[in-house]
Amino acid sequence: MERTYVMIKPGFLQHEDAIIARIEGIGAKVSHKKVMQLDDEILNRHYAEHIGKGFFAELVNYMKSGEVIAMYVEREGENLVQDIRTIVGSTKDPAPGTIRHDFGIGEITRNVIHSSDSAESAARELGIFFPEFN
């Protein structure tokens, strides 16, 4: 069973059902989810590689601006992380038919959704947001 982490960002929770339907459309399932209000501690752990970069403060402020939906996603087989990233779409120029294109507002930071970029990132992020299942 492969697993990955997906998070709906502040301001986009109204798209939860449609986003989950797209995840299920590739044969994956959201096995655990929770609505959370993020704080500095969890954001510093989640975005550790971005600490000190010019956009970090804006990113943290945005991510604290409202609730998020954290999701533990699983699927039998291979390539779950890549398949999720395909339906999510690129950060800068998402293609039509992707989650970021279809539900986004054209901003890089406020881009609807986060998904792990590798199996290693998925394990780390699931450990941060779902320690009870790791």
What are these regions (language model features)?
Residues M1-N134:
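Non-catalytic terminal and connector segments of soluble metabolic enzymes
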